């Protein structure tokens, strides 16, 4: 039996598209997700001078949510991180 590949997907409501990164284990995918969330949180705090809230959507999906003025528009931004197992 082959081992699955774990895919970490990051998508943001204020950006087009998404990024996907493969990992050999579930643990490594979630560790990368934590680092990515820390990096995004630091960028949000530096850029917008506010702290995003974290929302656990499901066991495999987490969101950072913050309200900001982007291009002169008030908007709620959601950055979603998801980990999926893909069987080969």
Regions found by a protein language model. Name each.
Residues 22-24, 85:
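Generic structural detector for well-ordered beta-strands
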Residues 17, 26-29, 65, 82:
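Short, intrinsically disordered, low-complexity terminal segments
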Residues 1-19:
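Short aromatic-glycine-(Arg/Gly/Cys) micro-motifs in beta-strand/loop hairpins
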Residues 11-13, 24-52:
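A short, charged, amphipathic alpha-helix used as a generic interaction element across diverse proteins
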Residues 38-88:
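Short, mixed-charge low-complexity intrinsically disordered segments
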Residues 8, 32-35, 71-74:
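Compositionally biased non-globular segments, especially hydrophobic aliphatic-rich helices
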